Amino acid sequence: MSKHTVLFELGCEELPPKSLKTLRDALQAETVKGLNEAGLDFASVEAYAAPRRLALKIVDVDAAQADTQKRFDGPAVQAAYDAEGKPTKALEGFMRGQGITVDQLSTFQAGKVEKVCYLKDVKGQSLDALLPQILQTALDNLPIAKRMRSAASRTEFVRPVKWVVLLKDDQVIEATIQDHKAGNVTYGHRFHAPEAVTLAHANDYLAALEKAYVVANFEKRQATIQEQVKKLADEVNATAIVPADLLDEVTSLVEWPVALRATFEERYLAVPQEALITTMQDNQKYFCLINAEGKLQPYFITVSNIESKDPTQIIEGNEKVVRPRLSDAEFFFLQDQKQPLASRKEKLANMVFQAQLGTLWDKSTRIAKLAVALSSITGANPADAEKAALLAKCDLTSELVGEFPELQGIAGTYYARIEGENTEVSEALGEQYLPKFAGDVLPKTKTGTTIALADRLDTLVGIFGIGQAPTGSKDPFALRRSAIGILRLIIENELDVTIEELVNLALQGYGDIVKDHDKTRADAVAFLEGRYRAKYEDQGVAVDVLQAVQALAPKSPLDFDKRVNAVNHFRTLPEAAALAAANKRVANILAKEAAPEGSVIEANLVEDAEKALFAELQAVTPVVEPLLAAKDYTAALSKLAALRAPIDAFFDGVMVMADDADLKANRLRLLAQLRNLFTAVADVSVLQG
């Protein structure tokens, strides 16, 4: 069967830049799905996207579907013919329905019954006949939140469609897609080459458009932007901040990227750089430049969509546009400094945190008391912790945070520094929100750790206390994410404290506001312990490893983490699978019949294998017990791995359920001693293979 290259392009008005890449990928996926469902073989489907177009190149696609046979089932052979071998009325009715004669019949075996059938040859449809509907269906299935209809068109799309190209090699496939007749004419850059571009062959697409100042390949366009931005940054000994989402958006805004470096007045560098970066990235789509120390430099890079004969005009235009935005940030910053942070508590007293839990000032005072209590656990200075907690939410009333909400905490840090607060206090104001997401950094200061922990605990316990725990997909206070943050703060700072102790401390701040302390405590502890799985699955830890540790229900997150790490390491040992299986066998035996009280009686050990296992246990126990006491669980399990050989020998040569009651009891005690050594770390019997 012959193979062809197909080009499809949908030309539109400017597509939403934040959706362009998603639309391209979805169009590719839906088309691949359609081709597969139609039974059309192909080598690849390449996808392209630029501001005014979505396109696909289907390489080496079949010219048509393969011919097939369709089976139509008739009556059973026994019911199809009479005693003389003539067709019965049932068979005649089947043949009449299919429009066939006796000589066109076949039979097939349906279980134990042989049945009559008709095998109809079905000729495969051509690519030309199938492709238009495949593409239209793909377009209909794109993830478009709000579709629009343009002019008299009956079809809807994310933006008005202007032209459609559909080529099979050098031939146009006759089709109407999105109410537009397909052809072989595309269009170049809106300003540099607005005239029509006729495509002679599907393979000419990318090259023809580049001659018309359009880079249709998204990745190539993006790589060009990255190269240009790096070159411009290198020229001033700086590094560009290039967030992935901003890079995607800028790539989606230009057909012919030309990066240009501009400047702004150095006086604006006195403003928190986070505010300047935010306004330049979010509002202007600029790439900001920083030096080796991470300090913002008085430059920015804009990516133009035209190759200007006078680029200085574009540069000056962007400098003129950005200046008012930087001036606004400067104004907010200076205005805020007229009112000390501590004096903002009156405004916090008028801002509701949660209707039943009070205002933000109520929350601040609770956090302050909790932070003082937590200081003995975190090692923070109680006075610093209390002061930082009382100042923590004050910047929420500032004009800078009002304009740039993402600067909450960060703005407070700047204002606290200006007011002369020490590093622990000022840094804690920004660190209180860390970690913000999975894998995010943690606070560097002890005070920051304390406030971050206190803030999360106060919210979690309070929300549980008023009966508004997360349900299903509803989690308005992001308690699931917050709980993982609490676990990380405890574990990664090596805080030796139980979850229940922390919940109790948080409950003290609520007093009578929380009516049922016992239920709140139980629910909050269970919720936090339930987040272990999400935390460790993000790290790639297997579920059975977690189950092995959870079987012991450790109370301390730090202790839980040490056990998880130990079991994770244990799984890598060559003895692990055999020891897990042996532990499972031991657990099953002891579940059926518990070991009698008392120690193993050495005189009742008669078999060489049980004597050897007992001797090994006696030797390893005094080595392992100090390791367990020191919570060095990894070393403890590594030592216990040496028991594999004597355990295997024991089960190969010893009958545990002996007829002699004394021998049986002694062997059960021996297995219980073995089991207790392993379960002092985790229940390794639940490990899979």
Swiss-Prot record:
EC number: 6.1.1.14
Pfam families xrefs: DALR_1 (PF05746), tRNA_synt_2f (PF02092)
Catalyzed reaction equations: tRNA(Gly) + glycine + ATP = glycyl-tRNA(Gly) + AMP + diphosphate
Keywords, ordered alphabetically: Aminoacyl-tRNA synthetase, ATP-binding, Cytoplasm, Ligase, Nucleotide-binding, Protein biosynthesis
Principal subcellular localisation of the protein: cytoplasm
SUPFAM superfamilies with a match to the protein in the record: HD-domain/PDEase-like
InterPro entries: DALR_anticod-bd, Gly-tRNA-synth_bsu, Gly-tRNA-synth_heterodimer
PROSITE patterns the UniProt entry points to: AA_TRNA_LIGASE_II_GLYAB
Subcellular location field: Cytoplasm
Organism domain of life: Bacteria
Transferase in keyword set: no
One GO-annotated biological process of the protein: arginyl-tRNA aminoacylation
One GO MF term attached to the UniProt entry: arginine-tRNA ligase activity
Homology family: Belongs to the class-II aminoacyl-tRNA synthetase family.
Assembly and oligomerization: Tetramer of two alpha and two beta subunits.
Protein name: Glycine--tRNA ligase beta subunit
Organism: Acinetobacter baumannii (strain ACICU)
